[in-house]
A protein has these predicted regions:
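Charged, alpha-helix-forming regions
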Residues: 1-290
Length: 290
């Protein structure tokens, strides 16, 4: 065999590896973490992407067994299609998610976020104790399991698609350290896309904590109110009933809605909440945003 043949390995993979060794090395290209800046956000507010706040992802559903979604298209506005896998999430779980995201936004997205469980519970207005800690752990698992695809349009043209090519979870993952009673939570950096272009609602946290226990519909409507700057807001009752995942008869929904609007008036989120008939003869909820 000639010297030339001895100098080159017979395997193509071996030759490729030899070429790589003699080429100048390149520094690995890694993710550059970036902190998410949300104009107007402070300790007085919690932020939620508008497409999430307008959808039925979080809803004032009854306690107990939750509906399980498998590739379900959630109820939302016509400019967004949200496909969801996971259990139906409620308003208490919305509180947890908003608070975790509030802490995560202080760091580059993707970095581990330390969350003390007792501090988290107190911040969302709950007690501390074994029952609450178990509830929080179940919620962390539910939020980590929850997976969604968000597709948004503007004037009928594609505007945003998140979660189809790469999965998107409400929480990417977490680890609990019992010795420190602390969670280390990871948030997918793709959430930056859903908060982008100021497409987020600022929820007044102090007012949310003042909403009475059992008034989850009021909490859900507070999030909806925050998605629009319009001074007077109108929502068809049929649309609102579906958005709130309220499956009892309309007559019961009207009563519950009146109570929720009164609660939001009490904590000064809205004013002059009422149900009236529009020019098409359809019932709608109307209120002024404060």
């Amino acid at each position: 065999m000639s010297d030339e043949h001895r100098a080159h390995p017979a395997s193509p993979l071996a030759r490729l590896e030899q070429i790589r060794r003699v080429l100048p090395g390149k520094a690995p290209v890694g993710r550059v973490p970036k902190q998410l800046f949300l104009p107007g956000l402070s300790e007085l507010y919690r932020a939620m992407p508008n497409h999430i706040a307008r959808s039925s992802l979080f809803a004032p559903v009854a306690r107990g067994a939750k509906m399980m979604h498998k590739e379900t298209v959630l109820f939302s506005r016509r400019d967004a299609v949200i496909t969801f896998w996971g259990e139906q999430l409620d308003e208490a779980q919305a509180d947890v998610w908003m608070q975790v995201m509030h802490e995560a936004i202080k760091l580059p997205l993707g970095d581990p976020v330390p969350i003390n469980r007792a501090s988290l519970l107190r911040t969302i207005g709950r007690q501390t104790g074994n029952y609450e800690y178990q509830w929080l752990h179940r919620t962390m698992k539910a939020l980590t399991f929850a997976m969604l695809i968000v597709e948004a349009t503007k004037q009928g043209k594609p505007k945003l698609e998140v979660g189809r090519a790469e999965s998107l979870h409400m929480l990417d993952r977490f680890a609990y350290d019992p010795s420190r009673e602390c969670y280390m939570v990871y948030i997918d950096p793709k959430w930056r896309l859903l908060y982008g272009n100021r497409e987020f609602a600022l929820i007044d946290w102090e007012k949310r904590l003042r909403i009475r226990k059992g008034q989850d519909m009021a909490k859900a409507i507070q999030r909806l109110v925050a998605t629009s700057d319009e001074a007077v807001q109108r929502f068809p009752l049929v649309w609102l009933k579906q958005r709130l995942q309220y499956f009892s008869p309309m007559r019961k929904f009207r009563k519950s809605l009146q109570v929720a609007m009164q609660e939001l008036e009490r904590v000064e989120v809205i004013v002059a909440g009422r149900i009236e008939v529009n020019t098409k003869g359809e019932e709608q909820a109307v209120w002024g945003r404060l």
